[in-house]
Amino acid sequence: MASKGEFAVVDPGDASPIHEYIKNTGFHLKEILITHHHWDHTGGLEELISEYKCSAYGPSGGHIKGITNHLEDNETFHILGDYKFTAFSAPGHTNDQLSYFCKTTSQPILFSGDTLFYGGCGRLFEGTPKDMLFSMDRYKKLPLNTLIYCGHEYTESNLKFANAVEPNNQEILKAIEEVKETRSQNKPSLPSLIDTELKINPFMRCRELTVIQAAEKYSNRKLNETAEVLGVIRNWKDNF
């Protein structure tokens, strides 16, 4: 995000692109947002803090070196002066994962880190299926036109899996073609939309009968809880 000669970055795994951006634009790095502790999201943090004396917002606990502003669930803060964000806990991928939501931009935006991807979700490295379901349900409550900026470009593989779960879902087939065309032009598939995810993302659709039936067929057992469905789908994706 940039405004009036200043900018903020999310999850700088490497400081080099930030240095290059500053060199090319002359903009001042004012703030950094960190979603979770994994190295590919924090690798450039200490170098950038040291070089540019900027603020860094991220999960509380003191386990991420370089964070200057520790955030709790539902805490609000401002970026670049004008943009009001809410940090909310989104466990599953990691226990400390935060997502950042802003509705003071022209269109609502979400920085989802590695919890929610276009067409998928993050691996359960620390959390449980119940944790991830909690996070998916939080995302569902956001405005449908919310732009989702996630941590990785995994969209094509995610949609391939989503199609395996729901082969007759026309929205998934449509998304596959759109993303294929976009990526063929060497453009990012991101951002996605909450509205899109509700139609195509199996981890957002764990209460849909088609997803439940697919999970039961894969696991060869009756699934009585939605978290069980998500857990089976996640295990399926891990081995897909």
Language model features by range: what are they?
Residues 1-2, 101-103, 162:
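Short beta-strand-to-turn element immediately C-terminal to the catalytic PLP-Schiff-base lysine
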Residues 120-146:
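Active-site-adjacent loop/tail segments of enzyme domains
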Residues 11, 48, 114, 152, ...:
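Residue-level signal for inorganic ion chemistry
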Residues 12-14, 37, 61-62, 93-94, ...:
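Active-site metal-binding loops of divalent metal-dependent hydrolases
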Residues 137-147, 156-240:
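Accessory terminal helices/loops
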Residues 76, 82-89, 94-129:
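Ligand/cofactor pocket segment of small-molecule handling proteins
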Residues 7, 14-89, 108, 174, ...:
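Active-site HxH/HxHxD metal-binding segment of metal-dependent hydrolases
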